[in-house]
């Protein structure tokens, strides 16, 4: 946590952050762009501490990136008119139950995030990390000005899985799929 003191644009989310659209093991390209590792971090609106840290980090990234945001223009656009990564799930994803009563941040990186468990031991089993788990994320915010688009973006540093959750995206777990079939072998043999 001491790194966040020296870096005002870095945030460690709370442990009740849910991961969605989790591409932590393999970089994926969107619309032919650069392949990136990414995750949508769903943050409950009740996690006021994490939301406060994210808002402060976005403001710090804005201040640090004023020259970049100004570009060739005469003035720096106000933060309120820029695209920022903290979005309201109730507004932008009203039909997705996973985003209800939550904010979300899409974080990405061209380099793979470090992934550890609750005891900070590396997770090597890819099936342990999926869309729907809960955990912390180390993220950083930075200003961008590219092809006329200006704003604040979110970089993905590392992930810490805290606990399992219901898989998102319709994927079921093998343990759940076959839970009701456990006693059927006896019928087959008799």
Region spans (language model):
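OB-fold/S1-family single-stranded nucleic acid-binding modules
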Residues: 146-166
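OB-fold ssDNA-binding interfaces and closely related basic DNA-contact patches used
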Residues: 1-104
């Amino acid at each position: 946590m001491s790194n966040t003191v020296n870096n005002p644009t870095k945030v460690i989310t709370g442990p009740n952050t849910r991961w969605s659209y989790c591409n932590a093991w393999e970089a994926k390209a969107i619309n032919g762009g650069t392949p990136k590792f990414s995750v949508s971090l769903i943050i409950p609106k009740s996690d006021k501490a994490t939301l406060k840290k994210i808002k402060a980090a976005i403001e710090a990234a804005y201040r640090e990136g004023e020259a970049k945001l100004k570009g060739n223009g005469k003035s720096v656009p106000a933060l309120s008119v820029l695209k920022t990564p903290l979005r309201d799930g109730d507004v932008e994803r009203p039909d997705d139950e996973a985003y209800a009563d939550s904010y979300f941040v899409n974080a990405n990186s061209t380099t793979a995030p470090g992934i550890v468990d609750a005891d900070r031991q590396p997770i090597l089993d890819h099936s342990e990390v999926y869309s729907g788990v809960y955990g912390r994320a180390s993220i950083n915010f930075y200003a961008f000005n590219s092809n006329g688009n200006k704003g604040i973006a979110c970089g993905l540093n590392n992930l810490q899985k805290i606990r399992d959750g219901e898989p998102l995206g319709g994927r079921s777990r093998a343990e759940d799929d076959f839970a009701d079939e456990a006693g059927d072998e006896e019928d087959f043999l008799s």
